[in-house]
Amino acid sequence: MINNFLIISCIGKDDKLGLRINKEFFVYKYEKKEISRESLVFYIQNFLKSHKVKLDEKFSIIVNQGPGSFSGTRISLAVAKGLVISKKIRLYGYKDEDLLEFNLKNIEILMKNKLIEKKLIKPIYLS
């Protein structure tokens, strides 16, 4: 079961970060239209720091695999994989069409319906 997690949705439309920690859920919406690797890392660091989150092997990252922006999807995956390697946390992915609305209730439905995949990553790009 995925308990505490960071969810990254950076596919070029309504980009957001979500954080579930100790049964609470927080959302951060990007202010920029285009996301860069540096800005995504900055947003994630500040978001985790503001909620006093410590990344460890019990923590998970869930990434939106698209379809969506090629660069946004690749940046999300690269940043997530970097955290996985450096912090030994678990990585999961989901398809954008499976998450009807970016909130905890719908994310938990994804988990319950086994629509979050551990076999990553097969991103879907729009061209």
Where are these regions (language model features)?
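Short glycine-rich anion-binding loops that position phosphate/pyrophosphate groups of nucleotides
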Residues: 13, 66-67
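A generic structural signal for short
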Residues: 32, 68-69
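DPxDG-like acidic metal-binding loop motif
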Residues: 60-65, 71-89
